[in-house]
Amino acid sequence: MNLHRIAFLSASMAAIGLVGAALAAEPPVLKAGLWEVTRTSTQQPDQKHLTTMCLDDSVQAEMREFGMGVAKEMCSQSDRRLEGNRMTITATCKLGPTTMKTQSVMVFNGNTSYHTEGTATYDPPFMNMAESKSTIDGKWTGPCKPGQQPGDITTETGQTLNMKQMMKK
């Protein structure tokens, strides 16, 4: 699996709190339907990136299983603690020759919204980045749109990708 696809899938799974799912602490199952996810990062602090995701329980379960496989394959350390509505995730993973250390804190508002703040360091730099910080906000907006399949992600450019299909490759 190439590094760009792993980075995209990891970012997508992180957006809904599913990375590192091999651990005992489980986040709430998010409400099925259409989710709007807004991400900002230190690389582009003045830009917000908006995607929508059509989620159901089966997509979340498959993403957790995929996340476990990626974590086992790429991470030497991962830890997830759930305290009330707050989940803290730390991990040390390899991206090719680069060691990535991450820490994310997610705060859930029931199963209909969440806020995440994350930091990652890269040694040596990954794609010219030594450090990145991001903020992700997700909220349930209603049922998936007609014609959407569970797992569909629509990017801000209008491109639709299906997470289930990407995880099978």
Predicted regions located by residue number:
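Subset-of-secretome marker
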Residues: A25-K169
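Bacterial N-terminal signal peptides that target proteins for export
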Residues: M1-S12
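Low-complexity, intrinsically disordered segments with a bias for serine/threonine
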Residues: A14-I16
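Sec/Tat signal peptide C-region and signal peptidase I cleavage site
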Residues: L18-A24
